Structure formats: structure tokens, C-alpha cells
Swiss-Prot record:
Keywords for the protein's UniProt record, in alphabetical order: Actin-binding, Repeat
Gene: abnB
Span of domain WH2: 4-21, 40-57
Pfam families assigned to the protein according to its UniProt record, in alphabetical order: WH2
GO CC annotation, single: extracellular matrix
Annotated region described as Disordered, given as residue ranges: 57-90
Listed name of the protein: Actobindin-B/C
Keyword 4Fe-4S included in the entry's annotation: no
Gene Ontology molecular function terms on file: actin binding
Task performed by this protein: Is able to bind two actin monomers at high concentrations of G-actin. Inhibits actin polymerization by sequestering G-actin and stabilizing actin dimers.
Superkingdom, natural source: Eukaryota
Assembly mode: Monomer.
Amino acid sequence: MSTTANPLLAEINKGTDLKHAETQDKSAPIIENVPIKKNDHSSLLGEVEKGAQLKHVETQDRSAPVTEGATVKSNNHSALLGEIKSKAQE
């Protein structure tokens, strides 16, 4: 099937004329008379290599579960089964 047989494809192939647009240079700073300084990477790297003084801190490990006062109740399983059997026989 050729593109000329389909009018929609023919219109797409023809293209369209674009309007002229003016661009605005927005690379300059918005505020007037502001000096733009370069980053001094060597001084930053020097500060990183020098390191920082850290102070000693005490930590409290609270990752363990709180189990104080938790008790396991007695399981009277045989009494429960006996009660079920007696009601089933009635």
C-alpha cells in the first residue's frame, strides 16, 4: 500500500510549517551584580582527607524485646478435653 493512497499518511508526510520562535538566554543570574565564584575542589578534598574530630558517645541498646513481667499461664489442656468429652456423651 503506498502512502499516496491513504490521505492521512499523505498529510503526515507533507509535514507542517513551524512558526519562528525567539529564545531567551536564561543562563545569567537573575539578581544583578552577583559574583559567581568557582568551586575550589582541592580545598574541599583537603578538608575531607584531614578528617573530623568525633566525640565519644554512649549508646543504649534497646533492640531486645521487653519481656519483664510477662508470664506464661498454665495450660489445663486435659481438663478442657475432659469437659468436651463429658458434654459430648450427654
